[in-house]
Amino acid sequence: MLTREQFEKIIKLAHDIEIDSYQLAVEHCEGYSYDGIEAAKRDLDKSKAKLVQYLEMIRWNNEN
């Protein structure tokens, strides 16, 4: 069973992904530079990786 703190962290990490996705969409629509779009993609990838890493840690802790 997940704790309240774990749920809150998952929600925060998912919210970070939402923000980064929005920023990437804005940069594509507003014609930002290629470097800006690439930076936004990297930020999104980092946010997703943090969530996956945290979920993997929870799964590992629950299995052991």
UniProtKB/Swiss-Prot annotation:
Top-level taxon of the source organism: Viruses
Protein name: Uncharacterized 7.6 kDa protein in mobD-ri intergenic region
Annotated organism of origin: Enterobacteria phage T4
Gene that this polypeptide is encoded by: y05K
